[in-house]
């Protein structure tokens, strides 16, 4: 699956983020807890250099908790502080400022020693489209400042947002890389809704989702579609699901487009429970 999606505002955002790094103390890198590596932009490492960072594992309520813990340990072993959060209901957000203060304590101690008046922490939020940046900012600021939605790429300009007296945030548009070298990365992003459905082959995404469920969560797959066994042939599996879900055309033929929609919707709306689509050891 070849996907190339790099709107002009993203190229501009990369340049502006690089400039804004001089103004900020710490970076909050927001990733999808279900796909922590695939939802990291490889370019971000080049952009951020050695800036202090906290990895925010967002949508943790949708991810397999045991796998999320593995990811947290993985990042901690790399010297990157990580927090599990849910930007929708606010879970874990009260840890962000204390963790930031801890990381920046030496810097602020040096500033105080030089007689510099204490100020709010200045942070930059960065991440790919649809990972929840705007929702996080609105939740932290307790008001609807940033535009939110399920359409990837909805935040198109940068803005500073005050969060109480202790934190100032710089929001940026989601920065997605020009193309995906690894097909699995594209499929993981697609199945979680990080890429516009209009530019991907949805049947490929549904097949990926089914194969993943078959390998990692087979009992959930069988339970959801009332299957005694999971057919090895993917076409037979599609037929079985289409028949169980009534995705039929005239003459009793399976409507594969409708079946594809059902499968992807079931995955994205957690009908299979909490899923993690990659592990640190994968």
UniProtKB/Swiss-Prot annotation:
Pfam families from the UniProt entry: MMR_HSR1
Disulfide bonds: none
Key words of the record: Cytoplasm, GTP-binding, Hydrolase, Nucleotide-binding, Ribosome biogenesis, RNA-binding
Residues the entry annotates as binding GTP: 58-61, 86-87, 130-135, 174
TM annotation in the entry: none
Subcellular location: Cytoplasm
A biological process from GO: translation
Source taxon at top rank: Bacteria
Record-annotated CP-type G domain positions: 14-178
PANTHER family: MITOCHONDRIAL RIBOSOME-ASSOCIATED GTPASE 1 (PTHR45782:SF4)
Subunit field text: Interacts with ctc. Interacts with the immature 50S ribosome subunit. 2 molecules of rbgA bind to one 50S subunit.
Protein name, UniProt field: Ribosome biogenesis GTPase A
């Amino acid at each position: 699956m070849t996907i190339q999606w790099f709107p002009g505002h993203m190229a501009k955002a990369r340049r502006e983020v690089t400039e804004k790094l001089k103004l900020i103390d710490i970076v909050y890198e927001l990733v999808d807890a279900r796909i922590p590596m695939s939802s990291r932009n490889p370019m971000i490492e080049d952009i951020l250099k050695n800036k202090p960072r906290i990895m925010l594992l967002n949508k943790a309520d949708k991810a397999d908790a045991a796998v999320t813990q593995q990811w947290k340990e993985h990042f901690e072993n790399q010297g990157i502080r990580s927090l599990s959060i849910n930007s929708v209901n606010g879970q874990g957000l009260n840890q962000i400022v204390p963790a930031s203060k801890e990381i920046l304590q030496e810097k602020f101690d040096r500033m105080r020693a030089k007689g510099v008046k204490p100020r709010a922490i200045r942070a930059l939020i960065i991440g790919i489209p649809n990972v929840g940046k705007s929702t996080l900012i609105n939740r932290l600021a307790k008001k609807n400042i940033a535009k939110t939605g399920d359409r990837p790429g909805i935040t198109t300009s940068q803005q500073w947002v005050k969060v109480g007296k202790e934190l100032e945030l710089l929001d940026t548009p989601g920065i997605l890389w020009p193309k995906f070298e690894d097909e699995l990365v594209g499929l993981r992003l697609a199945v979680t809704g990080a890429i516009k459905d209009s530019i991907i082959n949805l049947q490929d995404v549904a097949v990926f989702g089914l194969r993943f469920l078959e390998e990692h969560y087979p009992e959930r797959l069988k339970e959801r579609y009332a299957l005694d066994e999971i057919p090895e042939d993917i076409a037979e599996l599609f037929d079985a699901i289409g028949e169980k879900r009534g995705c039929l055309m005239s003459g009793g033929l399976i409507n594969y487009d409708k079946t594809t929609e059902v499968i992807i919707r079931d995955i994205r709306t957690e009908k299979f429970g909490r899923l993690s689509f990659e592990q640190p050891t994968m």
